[in-house]
């Protein structure tokens, strides 16, 4: 399949674009008429705009049927077309006033704020009509007229002063006249003084009033002189007067209109140049802000987007089928929240239009404009600003942004995970008789799944004249239908899936076998891969349809081809439970059993003796074998002292396999199957596994293993052991009470005493269990349970932890067999409940970790055979022990196994063992150890130089197949699944070493893995030496200071907690990178001080440490794939003469490419420093905006992508799934895509063994003669006697 495009670009829609895409203007807020149930004209569901509600029928019914296709009804204005256009056609709302898009001004960071250099708070004031913004200013006119205007102002001030003087003079003459009159009237002095005082107050008020007016004029003048474009001014008397007096020189407005006018006049190129100069000249915060602003400005320049598009004059109305209205019972309706939000916008918009037409006062109009802005904000992103808009029951309405983001958003709900046809679901039951590649499919389910294929076959073989008849035959359950079903399913694999699908083995292909009943039958050996059991689990069945899909299912996904676990390369289809019991019983030796000491000439003879009842399968006997492998040698014949049971077991193993003459428990069977997988073909291994399974079940049935209460044997000496340790514990308590011990020492002593007591009881208990005890058999063989569980049941419960994770120093002495006291029961359940809560939390945390890992590694696909970079990393194979001998490095099979050698491996005396380019197998590791090789240089994904993905040579073997990884293998996804799948097994706790706050808390388990993959700085991170030198220690009151004096006299100081355990002493000599204190390191510091290789090792080893502590095997290369993704970015330090910006986080390959271009053109190159980014940050910083948007922070990613006109090169898997392309992995790669599979003639003849030339001719014709005799075609078909021939 060839795609029509290679990349996707997202950019801003202009007003013209929206009008061009739209099919009409939505003018009314109405949805449908509740009487007629038809959409209202010009409303949110209008048929004139969005298309008809019925196929090929206009709104009024004048035009019906498809012959009127494309006709627009002159009566109702509806176009005659399919109703499906209501999913595609959009309308628009013409706004009465412009509004700002909330994503651009309320996002973090505010793009509008950076562009216009306005603080978000000030921007908010302008947009929501709380302040004016100056949008244009005639600076030249102001400059020219400034003197005249000032003279005019001075004249006004002079006039005010003259008026003031005149008013005061008038008041004085009035006062003198009044006093004269009062004196003439012989009024008292007090009265005259009162009149004088009042007059003076009046004159003071006059003076104050005129002074205020003058001061006001001065303020108006100062404000006018200080006016600048972009300046913000509150709506007060001063600014109103500035507008009245000097309104000809400037223009100021409020709301989105002000922003729009600023953006229309905004010069991007000029601003970019000014900011470039600022970056060079400025320092500190000004430089940082200039860089951030330039980043936004450059985004607009590169995308050629018009910034004015951030302000909207029209709003798109999405198709009505995407915001449906559904009729419920009792005549009520349920509608999408978007309809309510659109209705609010339309109502406010119509009201604003009416107010503008009426010429309403400005304050009322501004208030309505603000409400319109808020309504549009709620439509685009409800709750981003202010209180979210709520509907009925106080529920927040879902906006357009909410439709995209989150688990139930468009990306994750509909684009990345779709429901599929040809699928079913049922409960699973065990199918012990199935082969490894088979599953049991219920007949009824198969009939429904394969219905179209059965119909086709019935038509092909002329057993039904048409599709309707064929369907009726299937519904009736005609006998011929079952024959057709048998024939159809023969060559068709089905896929079985069990949720949760934590790794690739959660979906496997099987050949279906028809079974009665309604439950799917599952092979017992694949249960481990699916993590399935038969306590009510359900599984889904899917049907691969195309020939390519069937071929892939058969070759890549068939259960018998998926024997190895992709996480560590070990077999996952291991016998367990009953099978182990059976094999253990079969290979047990009982010296006194019947027939012991006899000799037989063959296994057959021994079996005959057993059938006669003369020989037990457990009796030690001598048997003559032919063609047997013993001690690595193949012998023509040999007499082996063994048991008949062991001989029967060895018959299940393939020819040429060494004879297993030992008791077969879980460990032995595991090593046998490991060896089989390494040496034999998959077909042979699958056959052997089936034989072992059958033998195991057969002899498990005959072993008669049962459990009774009498099998639980308690040690008789338990009380004696307990009383001895009780005395010791009492002594410790007394020492504490008289003050000889601290509380911490007491707790530690008691824990130590009771741990020893528990071990002694467990030891005594194991001795009490006889060899033939069934519980003993189960535990010893590895079939079920362990000695710790048996100790709880039969010995003593022992020490338990409280919910904080601390050990309670008083043990539970009773066992479950004896029964717990009330106190013991309470203490026991206290910690146990915490365990259950932890498990629930762990599952969610682990799932989220897997999701982040998948997201960061999803585009790591093998793209080429060899990147050509031959240097690798050195890995140890052996180490020299205290005895001076070489020993194999623990976990070598999880570090060097399956890798490609980067250089020849030679013995110390220069003999060649392995050549560069060879893959390291288990056998090769053994040869390295035998030859005394200490370390080897291997290729690694950490050093791979492939531009996209990784190369096959650097990755090495695929652990799932045991062969070199193929081009197209999605190794990133496999790595993420391998790390994430066992996540639930990891513990949640932060453990305390000692008492609750005695030492530094050590983060372990899942939180530690998250801490490492997110490259977080740990709490109380341990410092590392930044140079070679000597350490001195200074003790303070609360903390210690470590002072490192380097060899070149530099001094470094580190402050550490008083309780931290030091790794150095005063005067110790340290080397660069040495850890000075116990605890976790900060990966960023490791990178800074020791370099990239050290941080790679630290992260890989840190993650492995957590998984190994829980006994979870994972190969290093999976962790390396994730670490490679974490180290892909660099931070630009000096941008030189390139288009990069200082402080910019950029992909390493892109950085090198831009530097090469600069070098070729003779420009100054940039310099950068390596960064270690956490997986979340790395996922969001990916080249693909589609992948990042579907991961997290959808609105932020989309906003940035739109502004910068981001192009998605469609390299990763997620982005191709989203747009419906084949994924660029496996057979989806162009290398394999052009292959056209066709069935061979022999395959067709095998599918249709009874097809004859007459049928071929009949099928090629266009029509069938009604007189044609179909019975002639059924001659020779094997049909049941009672089958009616039509």
Swiss-Prot record:
Cofactor binding, note field: Binds 1 Mg(2+) ion per subunit.
Sequence positions that bind Zn(2+) 2: 867, 944, 951, 954
EC number: 2.7.7.6
GO molecular function, one term: DNA binding
Annotated catalysed reactions: RNA(n) + a ribonucleoside 5'-triphosphate = RNA(n+1) + diphosphate
Keywords recorded for this protein, A-Z: DNA-directed RNA polymerase, Magnesium, Metal-binding, Nucleotidyltransferase, Transcription, Transferase, Zinc
Required cofactor names: Mg(2+); Zn(2+)
First-tier enzyme category under EC: transferase
Alphabetized SUPFAM superfamilies for the sequence: beta and beta-prime subunits of DNA dependent RNA-polymerase
Source taxon at top rank: Bacteria
Keyword Protease: no
Positions annotated to bind Mg(2+): 533, 535, 537
Xref: Pfam families: RNA_pol_Rpb1_1 (PF04997), RNA_pol_Rpb1_2 (PF00623), RNA_pol_Rpb1_3 (PF04983), RNA_pol_Rpb1_4 (PF05000), RNA_pol_Rpb1_5 (PF04998)
Residues binding Zn(2+) 1: 58, 60, 73, 76
Keyword hit for Magnesium: yes
One GO biological process term: DNA-templated transcription
InterPro entries in UniProt: DNA-dir_RpoC_beta_prime, DNA-dir_RpoC_beta_prime_bact, RNA_pol_asu, RNA_pol_N, RNA_pol_Rpb1_1, RNA_pol_Rpb1_3, RNA_pol_Rpb1_3_sf, RNA_pol_Rpb1_4
Gene Ontology CC entries for this record: DNA-directed RNA polymerase complex
Record family assignment: Belongs to the RNA polymerase beta' chain family.
Subunit comment: The RNAP catalytic core consists of 2 alpha, 1 beta, 1 beta' and 1 omega subunit. When a sigma factor is associated with the core the holoenzyme is formed, which can initiate transcription.
Function per UniProt: DNA-dependent RNA polymerase catalyzes the transcription of DNA into RNA using the four ribonucleoside triphosphates as substrates.
Name of this chain's protein: DNA-directed RNA polymerase subunit beta'
Gene: rpoC
